[in-house]
From Swiss-Prot:
It is found in: Plastid, Chloroplast inner membrane. It is a multi-pass membrane protein. This is Protein TIC 214. Keywords: Chloroplast, Membrane, Plastid, Plastid inner membrane, Protein transport, Transmembrane, Transmembrane helix, Transport. Involved in protein precursor import into chloroplasts. May be part of an intermediate translocation complex acting as a protein-conducting channel at the inner envelope.
Amino acid sequence: MILKSFLLGNLVSLCMKIINSVVVVGLYYGFLTTFSIGPSYLFLLRAHVMEEGEEGAEKKVSATTGFITGQLIMFISIYYAPLHLALGRPHTITVLALPYLLFHFFCNSKKNFLDYGSTTRNSMRNLSIQCVFLNNLIFQLLNHFILPSSMLARLVNIFMFRCNSKMLFVTSSFVGWIIGHILFMKWVGLLLVWIRQNRSIRKYIQANKYLVLELKNSMSMAGIFSIFLLVTCVHYLGRIPSPIFSTKLNMLEKMEEEEEFDNNEEEEFDNNEEEEFDNNKTVDYMYGNQENLKFKILEKKQKDEEKNFFLFEKPILTFFFDYNRWNRPLRYIRKINKKLKGSVRKEASQYFFYTCQSDGKQRISFTYPPSLSTFGEMIARRISLSTLEKISPDELYTEWVFTNKEKKNNLNNEFINRIEALETVFLSLNILEAKTRLSNAETKNKNNCLVKMYDPFLNGMYRGRMKKLFSSSIINETSIENCTETAELNKIHDILLPYPNSPENEQKIERSEKKKRKIDSNNGLKFSLNEILTNPKREKKYIGINEIGKKPPRWSYKLINELEQYFKKRRKEQGIMQGLDHQLRTRKFKHIAFLTRSERSFKKSHFKNYNLYRKFNRDSGFISYLEEPDFRRAVIKDSMRVQRRKMVIWGPSQGNPHSPLFLEKMEDFPFPISDLMKLFFNIRDWLGKKSEFEILDQQFQIKKNNQEDVIEFWENIPYAQKSRSVLLLAQSIFRRYIKLPLLIIAKNIGRILLRQSPEWYEDFQDWNREIYLKCNYNGLQFSKTEFPKNWLIEGFQIKILYPFHLKPWHRSKLRLSDRDRKQQDDFDSCFLTVLGMETEYPFGPPRKTPSFFEPIFKDIDYKVEIRKFNFRIRRALKKIKKKEAKVFFFVKQILKELLKGKKIPLFITREIYESNETEREKDSIISNKIIHESLSQNRPKGLTNYSQTEEEMKHRIDRRNTIRNQIEIMKKNKKTVTLKKKINKKNNGEALPTIWKILKRNNIELIVKIFIEKIYIDIFLCIINMRRIALQLFMESTKKIIEKYIDNNETNKEKINKTKQNQIDFISTRTIKKAFDNLRNSKRKSNIFFELSYLSQKYVFLKLSQTQVIHFNKLRSILQYNGPSFFLKNEIKDFFGRQGIFDYEVRHKKLPNSGMNPWKNWLRGHYQYDLSQITWSRLVPQKWRNGKNQCQPSQNKDLNKWYSYEKDQLFDYKKKQNLKVYLLSNKEENFQKNYRYDRLSYKYIHSETNKKSYIYRSSLEPNKKQENSTRNKEKTVNILKNIPIKNYLGKSDIIYMEKNTDRKYLGWKLNTNIQVESNKDQIQIRDKIPNNGLFYLPIYSNSEINYKRVFFDWMGMPFDWMGMNEKFLILNRPISNPKFFLFPEFLILYHKYKEKPWFIPSNLLLFNLNINPNFSENQNIKGKHEEDEDFFNFSPSNSKQYFELKNQNNIEESLLESIEKLQILIKGDFPLQLRWTGRLNQLNQKMMNNIQIYGLLVSLINVRKISISYIQRKEMNLDIMRRRLNLTQLTKKGILIMEPARLSVKNDGQFFMYQIIGISLVHKSKHQSNQRYRNPQNVAKNHFDESIPRHKTLNRDKKNSDLLVPEKILSSRRRRELRILISFNLKNQNNVHRKKFFCKENKIKNWSQFLDESENFDRKKNELIKLKFFFWPNYRLEDLACMNRYWFDTNNGSRFSMLRIYMYP
């Protein structure tokens, strides 16, 4: 067995070595490249198939040789770099392909082009064989058509970098390719043999002999191949950008002219005189010195000469094919803030990796400047390697360590000396290291210091932020942040250091150049001195000075698109701005104007200046985009475009095209089966019935598609709009003045000839009623007389109001019916087509016009129908007369019989009639026998028939009389009749049919009676049930009223004794009873037992708390578990301990060092870096929140179930407003339940890091104030730390995302004046306790809730939005499903939150923030259980009023103010969007109709009359016709929905870099001056970067905690340097073991020990506060980021991947 296993192991290892060897892998990849088929295979197959004979054999050999040679060259180019560059560059392929295609074209076009007469065999002069060789060789190099992605061929290139012996790999891959090629050619040969032997194919070839002859003809094949190759190469050349037809970038001088158009238009128009004066000043200063002017002219000439000379110096190849030349890039990025603009360059990568010296070692930097690296390479080429001295890395590192130690010792000594001075000397600010400022040495005046913005000795926050303004001379005070003193005006630095990039200065200089005003140098010098010697008390108005310096021509230009060019042209026409040529392409658009200001309207106005009139009365219109795919995609005009070679377009218009390699990443895979399913459902819909709405939608879609087809037809024809416009105009004139008058004349002449009265007046009256309106391209009404702007080029429409239709006659008004009058008054309109026909809408199909002869034919048909109807009536009357005669005769006979006294039955049933007939037949048989025997002998011969019938009649009469007598006897004597039935069989047989008739009749009556009784019973049951239901509802309602009254009485009683009761924050008894009632009902319906999943955890612990004695052994396994807590928290066990249920000793204790990674632990203390799980997962490839020693504890899966039931639900005992726990699932409360659950789960996860959180209590303090710890003393400042707002609302931070387990949102509860709290046995309703927290929001106090309803109505939200007032509304109405105004949870924080999503301090997230000065953290509540306010506390206040609502009359004013605030929110730079609801099509149609009518009304004189007619016809919608649309009403009605536009979250390396390095952009509230120091009382215990507003620290009392932070002694720069030097030489002192599985290098040192939040923090808070201020301020991360202290996985030099941001040494 051992031998077998040994042999087997050796065999497996041998096989693995063989498989992994370079030769086998090369053979495999070479074999795969065989399937990369290109055009060269076509030449090879042609030579093998079509060529025959000796010459054919030579051509086969030459084709195979050329093919293999070309492939060999391709394989060699993989290894040999120059050959790879030659064959890989696009210009080389272009140079090779174009001449060869030309040569090949001439070879195939002329037959004797290569024929040199008779040649010997094996002669090299036979150029046709050489041509075959070149074809296969060159087209093997140009293998680019069939598989453009060339994925199989690139596998060889990829694997070559992974092996060491590259030449062996290339050789083996070439051999593998030859093997695959041989097999492929053998397969092709077998395929040809099979085709020749197949009979069906042979029959087809024989039937098409001419086709075979054509294929055999060499010229036709050569022509086919030449065409095919031409198409192939054109397709290939279309993939590369055109290097010839492109445009140069505009020069810098031209681009500077564009910047003047960014100025304010109104200022430019209104301040002409002032600007002219400024221009004089500018010229006076700039051109006072003529030397500057000469210098500029010489510099410009020198630039032009350098450019021209530089063009000829370049090599020809680089001049034509250099992709880094003057050509424009492909894309141009526009930023939202309009400050960061620029185009995208190919060579500008996101990261640039290069080696540099960092920490004394060679490290890879990913942000190395590319220009510096190229400069270093250029220097290295110039300087020989022998002159450079190489220093070993060890020497560099030791030198670096030595210098750092010296620096550290010096700083330590200085720091120690300053601290000793503090201990001996009084506290003085002189001991603190002051900031070094640049000032005049002679005068030590503070005012002579240079402004902080330009002070080179200041950096960071002290220099402030530079804001780029339109005016360079005005320095805004707000741009210099954290400046306590106001700097006086100093204009010297403004002249020496002007504000850069000033469009105002450039504008004034350019104007002065245009006017060419010359002012001598003396005046200029005088003006300069006056500007320097200024009075500080003067107004801050400066003249713009051109900056001294040179602007580099790198991305200094500014590009505009076609839309901007169009508007600038319009402004130029209006005398406002100048037009420019566009450089960016946009979608095709048309400006649709419905109101223009012409000279005619100017004459009617009160303006005297036409330009002024055009400025204040601009044309009104909007931009309409054509509905077609936009493939230009904002591409720069005349740029080199590269087609996407790997892109596959599935449909005619695809929004996000990409390679098929990434189809698996798509959520909706575009598999053809989806199209088949759609086809199946469409067929099913066609076969079935459709509703009216579907039919209308389909008709609308068909109309829209037809309209788009017609528009596309006119757009594609050259000069179509001009010809169409002229034809429309001609058709309107022809219709108006020629066609219709001729028709009227012809009609009236015909009426005269037919001896009828003519209708000249009526016809011409209808003709004059017709109105022709000129409309724009989309059909918007423009004017009756004026044409739209550019109507000949852009096209226009002609709309006809009340179109004239010729009628054969007119009825008089007296004869008009109501229907005719209504039809006459109806408004009708249509559009004129090019053919003179009418259509309902622009570019629509022609409609059917009423025919002239149709009324005549209708009249004739009507008369004919009347005659037919009269004839039918006459025939019917004749038939009725005949029937009436018969009926009269029948009645007459019946009356005669009645007069005789005979009873004649009018109605005889069928059964009785049949029974009588049978009896008659029997009687007739018997009687016939008797009569035949008796009378046959005595009757005479002539009277035989008559006597026989007479005898029969007599016999029947006698028989009837006997039966009637018997019936009467039976009625009298019933008993005798029954005895006779038993005895006499004959009588029994006669009585049975009569009894059956009676029974049958009785059964029918009984069935009918039973059915009627059943109906009556059902009716009575329904009536009884209705009474019972009404009674039940009445009883329930009265019961609720009584319960409510009892609850109110109980709450009034408990207001007195509320301090004596222990409040337990569980669910109320009413909720429990209601839930159990629902459970019992569900149990009755489903007949199942109770399950544990129906009970929530709160209910279980409620029952546990209510029991007096608990068998502790049953709960020991749960309550005494020492491992990680799965679902029970410490405060639950603390509560049971206080209740006396079990001891504290059995509580599970928190294990030491079970915290999280200290790096993450510290980052979580700073809200800027408290990222979500998904964000961290992209940076750190590990699970979130590992346990100790990299052990992931088992996690309760119920925490991650979003829509799971309330099973094992965590609850927050320390919350002030109780969470309702619904035991059964409810759709209306699904969002509320999930939101609370997510909030609690977030706190549960964060409870380890926050010692003052809701769900945390230290395990080392078991018996500390147990009697007063029934509620937690909340630290309101920490709430934003527990539930931080971070990043911004993106796809990775939405609460509805299933993967998101890290909650980010604030749980809001709006406290009203009545607050409901759940207690043990009853509901407690009580007023607010005026115990305001540290932060609270004021609102006007009133007893009614109407003002709050006004607030929510204004916001477009229901009153119980997000459940904030659900406790108030429980007593008034049932909870409805709320419609949310905004998708995220918070609205008030939204505008602040969007400004700087990750750098806003927590306390600034509140607006109108008030600080209660009487608030103290250490409030001791002994016997009185008061309630703290919520963090978001809408509490009554008398100092400030959020809404100034004094009476009902002020409501309107407050609403207007609130609407203005909402408009500011919308108009601001916030990513909000307005979304239409489902009524989009209807509202759009109404809006378009109103716009058409508005455009017509504005251009008319008599507006009132026509507008009233429009309103009467209900064509103008008055609901939409408002001057200012009320946004709140639109949102309240559901027409508009405001929701945030989700910003795209680009979680890449650049995003995290900016987050870390951008901490220097701290909010201005954190900028504190050096003279002030922090108050530890004002800082949250676990949130050290929080700062307090300055007015909070004015009236503070001096306490022991107001100690100076030692680090503040040094300056920020020295302090930073000391921290970094200390961190370099720290030892590994981490208590928690960390497994370095991210890095493979073992020599990387660990970072310094972070502040571990352990029990020492609770004992020595003040010391740790100081230490934390010392070691980890906010600048710590900035220092490490600026020093490029990051770590990369650099084991493999060919791949660079930033696994995570790693801090070391």
